Structure formats: structure tokens, C-alpha cells
């Protein structure tokens, strides 16, 4: 033996295991660096995303508010238009409404006399409810209407109805007095059916409540409020556009 150790000298290059450890350390360091960079980026994008979300939320709320406002406006507009009376041509009588409570008036329902005759006659305007309509405005092409004429005549129906009611009243009292020759049967027969159709046409739906016993025998109709057309306004219109000066309810 020469006295030297038999161990081999260490190689100057690192072993495979030591290389693996170094690589893992470098990889971990790199991953930590990348992770920190991503955290930094996410930290920068966080407020930006939050601001964008808030902006989109505000836009959505604004759009919904606008839609709700438009819907409410259209609803109110449609309801208002529905409540407004239809636009009438200049030659048409006014259609205004008012509340009226029905009550018995003896001057109309009682026996004939000078006072009652005056009261009934005063229900009719001068011209007996006949009006003049100029052809300067559009007039519907009714049967028998000559559109070539410069003006037309028309009878406002309510005054025709009042005339018919008066004629049936006059016929009743004439017959009760035994003066049957004063009753124009054809005229009265016409008036009965004309008034029937007029009443059914307007069909007043006011409810007349049954009274408590012992008055639960029916209804007089007195004391109930009705929605009525403004008769005074129609009377004034017929007077302004009257076709004549005669003021009578009969004939």
C-alpha cells in the first residue's frame, strides 16, 4: 500500500439531485414572481371592473326608469283621451254633461192649464228645435239630403221627443174629457214608438234602490242623481242656429 486513500476524488460538476433542487427553487421563485405580477395586475383591474359594473348598473336603471316613465305617460294620455268627449263638427249640438236629481214637478205632471201650458212651451226654443246648417262644412250624406243646397235644415231630436211627450199628454187629457175627436191617433201612435226607441237608445242605467219596508213596493224614481246632457247648452245652441222664430210645442 502506498498510504494513500482509496476514495475517488469529487467531481467538479453538481449531481443530478442537487440540480433538481436548484431547478425547483428557481421554478418556485419564478412562479412567485408571476403570481405577484398577476396580483398587481388584478389589483389594478379591480377598481376598473368595479367602476364599469357601476356604470352599466346605472345605465340599466336609467333605461328602466325611462321605460316606466313612457309607459305611465302613455297610460295617462290614453285615459285622458278616453274621458274627453269626441270632437264634434261645428254644426253639431254640444255634448256637455251635468248631474241632475230627479224630483216631481206638478207644473208638468198636473192637470192642463195656462201655467202648465206655458211651462211646457218654454221647454222648446224659438224655431221649434229646427236649426240651419250651412254646407260650408262636411255634412253626412243622409237619405233624402240634397247636398247641392247652400244650407240644410235639421231638427234636434230632444225637442222632437219633448213634442211627442206633450202630444201624448194632450191626447190623454182630451180622451179623459171625452173629446176623442181631438186625439190624433196616428200622431200619438208614432210618438209612443218614437219615445220608446229614444228611451232605449239613451238607456239611463242609474240604479233606483228599493226602499225598506213598508215602502218596498217599487220606485217612484224621485231623489236619484243622474248624469245628464246639459239641456240649457243644447237649448242655447238651437236658439242661436234656429231656422225660424215660432216657439210652440204642439203642431
Curated annotation (Swiss-Prot):
TM annotation in the entry: 58-78
Domain comment in the entry: The 2 HXXHC motifs are conserved in ustYa family proteins and might form active sites.
Phylogenetic classification of the source organism: Eukaryota, Fungi, Dikarya, Ascomycota, Pezizomycotina
Top-level taxon of the source organism: Eukaryota
Subcellular location: Membrane
Sorted UniProt keywords: Glycoprotein, Membrane, Oxidoreductase, Transmembrane, Transmembrane helix, Virulence
Glycan-modified residues: 135
GO MF: oxidoreductase activity
Similarity section: Belongs to the ustYa family.
Consequence of gene loss (knockout): Abolishes the formation of phomopsin A and related metabolites.
Stretches for region Disordered: 1-47
Pathway per the UniProt entry: Mycotoxin biosynthesis
Entry protein name: UstYa family oxidase phomYb
Function per UniProt: UstYa family oxidase; part of the gene cluster that mediates the biosynthesis of the phomopsins, a group of hexapeptide mycotoxins which infects lupins and causes lupinosis disease in livestock. Within the pathway, phomYb is probably involved in the construction of the macrocyclic structure of the phomopsins. The pathway starts with the processing of the precursor phomA by several endopeptidases including kexin proteases as well as the cluster-specific S41 family peptidase phomP1 and the oligopeptidase phomG to produce 10 identical copies of the hexapeptide Tyr-Val-Ile-Pro-Ile-Asp.
